[in-house]
Amino acid sequence: MISSDSRSSPGLARWAESYEAKCERRQETRENRRRRRNETTCRQPGKVLRTQHKERLQGARQLQFLKRRNLEEEKKGQAREQGPSSKTDGGTGQVSILKESLPGANKASFPGQQETGISSEVFPALHHSSSGIQRDLGGHHASHGRAFPPQDSDIKKPHRQHRGTQTKAEEALPTIKNDASQQTNCGVAVLDKDIIQLSEYLKEALHRELILKKKMVILQDLLPALIRASDSSWKGQLNEDKLKGKLRSLENQLYTCLQKHSPWGMKKVLLEMEDQRSSYEQKAKASLQKVLEEKMCAEQQLQRAQLSLALAEQKCQEWKSQYEALKEDWRTLGDQHRELESQLHVLQSKLQGADSRDSQMSQALQLLENEHQELQTKLESLQGDGEQQSSETQDLQDQLKKSEEEKQALVSKVQQLQSLLQNQSLQLQEQEKLLKKDQGLPVWNPKLSLDEVKPEGTRKEKEEELRDQLQKETFQLQVKENELQCGQWLPVLMVVIATALAVFLANKGNLVI
């Protein structure tokens, strides 16, 4: 059963469309995508030509280097180890096509050369053209072998699922036993097996379409190389025709020369040509020696450059490590800078608080100075009052002495009164004991005479009077003691105030200093 894809149908209208409409819409989107031009910044023609030219030059240099170093056998062994996957069909096909299109490039046998025996060194243009074509073919083959190895391997050996045109529904779904069916919007019943087969066919078609797109991309990349190869073959054929014409003209000239000149003259000409040939060979040997020397120098320079490159890489790594260390130091310094900035803000806030406190302290100092002046005035007034109070204290001391004498007299009187009270209390206790004894007798007359009652009443009155006198005298003594205490504390207070003022003035002098 095909589930509706939420990514392909974001709107509510697509939910209501039929299966055929969905298929048509998807086919249209595929066609639109397929018709797009597959040109990007990495597939620009000028850039491709430049890269291919560079790769061609590099491949030719590498081949010469390998020939001189005798490293072709190692390269063949590596190619054998890589297996047949590295050998692409596109490259071999291209080389075979170009070889077929150039029939005269490799067949460089001319009748004039066989008859006259002239060596091929006299005509180097033909060899240069054929070697250039072969280099072009090798460069194209190498560039395409490097650029598209996985795609060519896919084309050579496709997967088994891509070979067939149909898939077996029984192998895909072995668990389905009952043929279930579904009803479409038109009312036609369709089996689930058919729907699954259709979905598999669609998947297979999409996969084949992707493979065809890849093949089209590869062919598009191979097309400019084939065009260039055809141009080079056409130019080679033109050069070959030109060379053939030159050879014919030279043969005609030689024939005319043979008819005009004698064999002795021809021998002289041949001797001169041999001398020229030997001189040319010597010059060629000298040039080859120079080239070999230049090659050795270039190899030495290359080795030096490689050594300098290795040293530069080591230095680069060292600089990288130093850069990373400096980066970490910079981060730590940044953190420290931020911490110091935060501390500076805190100190600025503290300084502002200290300034505000300083202003408050200055205001408080002015207030204290004002209070000091007021206290000085008060001290002067208090000193005058102290002199008066000293005279008053002397008077109070005299009064205190008098009051102490009176107090001693009163104390003696109180002691006498207390002794009298004790005696009276003892007498009363004895009388109570006697009364209790009289009550215990069998005959008791409760009536008392007036003479006995009166002394008891007089005693009670006397006791009350004595108590009142004691209370009055004690109250007077307490009042006098309080007055004496207040009189004693006044000079003490004066002394304390004077010491406080002296301490304040001393502290003020220290602050001013």
Swiss-Prot record:
Q: Which residues lie on this side of the membrane: Cytoplasmic?
A: 1-485
GO biological process terms, alphabetically, are: antiviral innate immune response; cellular response to interferon-alpha; cellular response to interferon-beta; positive regulation of interferon-alpha production; positive regulation of interferon-beta production
Explain the consequences of disrupting this gene.
Answer: Knockout mice have considerably lower frequencies of CD4(+) and CD8(+) single positive thymocytes, and concomitantly higher frequencies of double positive thymocytes. TRAF3IP3 deletion also affects regulatory T-cell transcriptional programs and stability. In addition, mice show a severely compromised potential to induce interferon production and are vulnerable to RNA virus infection.
Q: Where is this region: Disordered?
A: 1-96, 130-171, 381-402
What the protein does? Adapter protein that plays essential roles in both innate and adaptive immunity. Plays a crucial role in the regulation of thymocyte development. Mechanistically, mediates TCR-stimulated activation through recruiting MAP2K1/MEK1 to the Golgi and, thereby, facilitating the interaction of MAP2K1/MEK1 with its activator BRAF.
Q: Does the keyword Membrane apply?
A: yes
Q: In which tissues is it expressed?
A: Expressed in bone marrow, spleen and thymus. Not detected in heart, kidney and liver.
Write the protein's name.
Answer: TRAF3-interacting JNK-activating modulator
One molecular function GO term is: zf-TRAF domain binding
Cite the record's note on assembly: Interacts (via its coiled-coil domain) with TRAF3 (via isoleucine zipper). Interacts with MAP2K1. Interacts with PPP2CA; this interaction targets PPP2CA to the lysosomes. Interacts with MAVS. Interacts with TBK1.
- Keywords from the UniProt entry: Cell membrane, Coiled coil, Golgi apparatus, Lysosome, Membrane, Mitochondrion, Mitochondrion outer membrane, Transmembrane, Transmembrane helix
Read off the lineage from the record. Answer: Eukaryota, Metazoa, Chordata, Craniata, Vertebrata
Ranges annotated as biased composition (Polar residues): 386-397
